[in-house]
Amino acid sequence: MKHRITAALERFSRAMLAPLTYLSAAGLLLAAGALLTSTALSGALPLLQWGPVRLMGRILYKCLSAVISNLSVLFCTGLAASLAKQEKHQAAFIALMSYFIYLTAGNVTLAELGLLAQPDGLTGLYGAGQTSVLGIQTVDTGVFGGVLLGLLTAHVYDHTCKKAHRGILGGVFSGERWSFTCMAALAAVLGFGACFVWPPVQKAIAALTGSLAASGNIGLFLYGFLERLLVP
């Protein structure tokens, strides 16, 4: 039992590294774009004031910011592809479609209940507990939502991708299409449930961080202790 748990954790840790592998390069390119558009640096280097250079820097910065801002999507597809034992590309594709369903289910639920926050002119959705992912406003679960859906997709896909049904609709709801059908239903339920489950979790996290910040040296000790505890 212990060996199985250890092996599962090792697989999970390796799968988590798959999306992170590219973030170092993305971070460097993002920094390069920021430098090319830096007002302070352009005063010392007149070349950076040239229109094409500034345009290239702005494109580079905006494009890489889009990658960094959508880590949940990367974790969802990356984990599904890494953990699936067969036809990994199919698992990644199903994970991406499931993530769209998850986001939209949350958006529709919030809209129907009148809970959809209105973005502020200055701060946007900051502090509202909601965010916009791929143009869809929903509950802000951060990367947790993507990680959870990626794990579920890999598990469901491995157990359903070979399922064959008989009858008229057997050809439609068999194999990978049955995996997608199962994940579509599960993603919709998760998107709906997140609207009710996640806000209390957000409040608990905010209260915990506020307590640590207000506790002075004790809070610093607890933060450092927990951080070191998580280092493998």
What are these regions (language model features)?
Residues 148-151, 177-178, 192-195, 232:
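Generic detector of multi-pass transmembrane helix bundles and their immediately adjacent loops
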Residues 1-4:
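Acidic, low-complexity cytosolic linker/stalk segments
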Residues 142, 146, 179-183, 220:
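Residue-level signature of transmembrane alpha-helical entry/exit and packing/kink sites
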Residues 157, 185, 189-200:
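Hydrophobic alpha-helical membrane-associated segments
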Residues 171-178, 182-185:
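Membrane-interface loop-to-helix entry segments
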Residues 6-167, 171-173:
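Early transmembrane hairpin of solute transport permeases
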Residues 191, 198-232:
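Aromatic-rich transmembrane-lumenal/periplasmic boundary elements in polytopic membrane proteins
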